[in-house]
Amino acid sequence: MSELLNYVASCRLPTEWGVFTMHGFEEAGGQEHVALTVGDCSDGNPVLTRIHSECLTGDALFSKKCDCGPQLEAAMKAVQAEGRGIIVYLRQEGRGIGLINKIRAYHLQDQGMDTVEANVALGLPVDARDFRLAQSIYEYLGIRSVKLLTNNPEKIQTLKDAGINVVERIPLHVGENLENKRYLQTKADKLGHLMSE
């Protein structure tokens, strides 16, 4: 399929918000990723999409430290409402540092550091994700043009650099609470996320 990912299998995935088709992909090193699709995404028209990085704490454990779970839920609802779209779910926990390192970083955040300071203090990258994986999935599914649900300009640029036409960026401002207010501000101030529209 591509040098980054290989397609493995697809299945029907009924959810609280509707039925998706789940497509499984695997990196050469064994890391697995999925894409959830609704409708025909390969007809050449711009496809509503979200590139979502795995967040066990937010997506599955409902942590209020981040906005990941609410973003995933909002994206799934939006794709179902549109009747056509794709959610690329990349297994890049903790902005790519892994779950255990994320727990270590959370410990430092509990002591007063922000999300960027904690990663740096641990000698870890601030963001180690590789959004080119999404481009490989789009390529396999025949997607060349997207409407991207994101606040992260790096996702937009990576797709543009890969030849994907990003016709629209749709802000995804959900899940703010007292626990994650500083985290969201840090994403805006230090990571360039577009949090004010």
From Swiss-Prot:
It comes from Neisseria meningitidis serogroup A / serotype 4A (strain DSM 15465 / Z2491). Keywords: GTP-binding, Hydrolase, Metal-binding, Nucleotide-binding, Riboflavin biosynthesis, Zinc. GO terms for cellular component: cytosol. Zn(2+) binds at residues 55, 66, 68. Coiled coil: none annotated. Pfam families: GTP_cyclohydro2. It catalyses: GTP + 4 H2O = 2,5-diamino-6-hydroxy-4-(5-phosphoribosylamino)-pyrimidine + formate + 2 phosphate + 3 H(+). The active site is at residues 127, 129. This is GTP cyclohydrolase-2. One of its GO terms (molecular function) is GTP cyclohydrolase II activity. Catalyzes the conversion of GTP to 2,5-diamino-6-ribosylamino-4(3H)-pyrimidinone 5'-phosphate (DARP), formate and pyrophosphate. Gene3D superfamilies: GTP cyclohydrolase II (3.40.50.10990). Belongs to the GTP cyclohydrolase II family. The gene is ribA. One of its GO terms (biological process) is riboflavin biosynthetic process.
